Amino acid sequence: MSAANPETPNSTISREASTQSSSAAASQGWVLPEGKIVPNTVFVGGIDARMDETEIGSCFGRYGSVKEVKIITNRTGVSKGYGFVSFVNDVDVQKIVGSQIHFHGKKLKLGPAIRKQKLCARHVQPRPLVVNPPPPPQFQNVWRNPNTETYLQPQITPNPVTQHVQSAANPETPNSTISREASTQSSSAAASQGWVLPEGKIVPNTVFVGGIDARMDETEIGSCFGRYGSVKEVKIITNRTGVSKGYGFVSFVNDVDVQKIVGSQIHFHGKKLKLGPAIRKQKLCARHVQPRPLVVNPPPPPQFQNVWRNPNTETYLQPQITPNPVTQHVQAYSAYPHSPGQVITGCQLLVYNYQEYPTYPDSAFQVTTGYQLPVYNYQPFPAYPRSPFQVTAGYQLPVYNYQAFPAYPNSPFQVATGYQFPVYNYQPFPAYPSSPFQVTAGYQLPVYNYQAFPAYPNSPFQVATGYQFPVYNYQAFPAYPNSPVQVTTGYQLPVYNYQAFPAYPSSPFQVTTGYQLPVYNYQAFPAYPNSAVQVTTGYQFHVYNYQMPPQCPVGEQRRNLWTEAYKWWYLVCLIQRRD
């Protein structure tokens, strides 16, 4: 064994570090990962969302001078619940790990900070590699920015643990030497941050900036970094709606000391920025793997052909390649928000050209409903081939030219109700063939001018929808025959040319949907029987054209009040005279 693995100074140090790691965490009962202990640094777990870096640093100040507290966050800046505390001078990490620290009434989980070692190819048998494919065609919009390739590359992960195969198969070249030196510089540049950077080549004169707040814009960030050199460009990464993802890149015109910038502490708008070198991930060349037969996914089905309309797409997207036979057109569940053609409803039901949830105002059509997402002119779930328009899907699914939830006042038609959302001229679920218009969505939820559920044959208009969602001029549930107008909705929620929930006072019609929500000029819940007209909403609660909270009396009522007031005043005067 020793002949196969001759000891080197590095291996001896690593073994001693692993031994120290095991003993340091003995009190915690952990089995630590293989790797090298980061000196004078403590892993801290169980960090509550209320804790900030300043408080944690003051808590650990009893053990020595704290150099930095690093709370690990996700891309949006939300804490992942753990972090690292590094000290300026040498400290007894084993003693700190063995102590019991409670903070905000919560016990912190302590351990040594371990930098995992990468397993070199010569330590393992050569194994076939699984290459992650580039994003499928529906993700082409994330590549629309031609500058994106500077920062994003298809993810490549070897299976199971190694990222390179035998170094003998890859003789060193000047380029490989430069790349290795760049990686070394990357590791040292981020040492103060305690990061393990991805494999790749550093983009020169460019800094990664994380923890960007929504209030920060590119101009402010550029002026903040102007102290280090002439800023060429500030790029904040956003999603397709233009909302910041919380990170970006700052590039400089001239050569700058990226390592110095990364090591500095920059606070902006009261928030510490997370800095690091910009890494361009390396692509794994074909010569690094054994040739294997591949299963190539076919192009998207016809309804997805719109994603190929951009002639530049081939620059960034290639057919998906996965060495696994289980890859036929499968649309994942849940939806992918950054796809232009992601329409998933119910149980993995794909569609075409719709507005997702949440809605993106840059879409020509605003068609969104609830949780599962519906659209325009596609095969419903289940399909009704006899319908001229197929627009239904899953549980809550309506479409074309209607008012969503929440309401969008720019729609010419305001027809939306609560959770399930119906629309215009399509086959309902289930269908009512006796209706001239089939407009239903969800569980049996129809609207305009059709046979209601249940039907009221004595009503001039049949406009009711399942559990919630009614409209205009129909027989109520239960019916109030003495009312000239019947406007009620099952349990709650009326419709037709109305203002959605919450109400928008700018609407000429005030007909609200929600739980017990009023309609047009009426007395809300509970019912007021003295109303001239009974128009019910909510739990059958009368309304329409009634006396709002008591108003000032007029005419005879005013005279009677003055008479009563005079009587009381006269009695008071008599009592005062007797006294």
From Swiss-Prot:
Residues annotated as domain RRM: 40-115, 205-280
SMART domains linked: RRM
Sample GO molecular function, one term: mRNA 3'-UTR binding
InterPro entries: DAZ_dom (IPR043628), DAZ_RRM_vert (IPR037551), Nucleotide-bd_a/b_plait_sf (IPR012677), RBD_domain_sf (IPR035979), RRM_dom (IPR000504)
Signal peptide, first to last residue: none
Gene3D superfamilies: 3.30.70.330
This protein's UniProt keywords: Cytoplasm, Developmental protein, Differentiation, Nucleus, Repeat, RNA-binding, Spermatogenesis
Tissue expression summary: Testis-specific. Expression restricted to premeiotic germ cells, particularly in spermatogonia (at protein level).
Annotated compartments: Cytoplasm; Nucleus
Compositionally biased spans, kind Polar residues: 1-10, 163-175
Region entry Disordered, spans: 1-27, 163-192
Domain of life: Eukaryota
GO BP terms in the entry: 3'-UTR-mediated mRNA stabilization; cell differentiation; positive regulation of translational initiation; spermatogenesis
Further remark: DAZ genes are prone to deletions but also to duplications. In a population of infertile men, DAZ genes deletions are associated with oligozoospermia but an increased number of DAZ genes is not a significant risk factor for spermatogenic failure. The DAZ proteins (DAZ, DAZ2, DAZ4 and DAZ4) are all encoded by a strongly repeated region of the Y chromosome, in two clusters each comprising an inverted pair of DAZ genes. They are very similar, which gives their indidual characterization difficult. Thus, most experiments do not discriminate between the different members. One can therefore suppose that reported interactions with a DAZ protein involve all the 4 proteins.
Family affiliation: Belongs to the RRM DAZ family.
Purpose of the protein: RNA-binding protein that plays an essential role in spermatogenesis. May act by binding to the 3'-UTR of mRNAs and regulating their translation.
PANTHER family: BOULE-RELATED, DELETED IN AZOOSPERMIA PROTEIN 1-RELATED
Domain characteristics, as noted in the entry: The DAZ domains are essential and mediate the interaction with DAZAP1 and DAZAP2.
Disease listed for this protein: Spermatogenic failure Y-linked 2: A disorder resulting in the absence (azoospermia) or reduction (oligozoospermia) of sperm in the semen, leading to male infertility.
Protein name per the record: Deleted in azoospermia protein 4
Species of provenance: Homo sapiens (Human)
Gene name for this UniProt entry: DAZ4
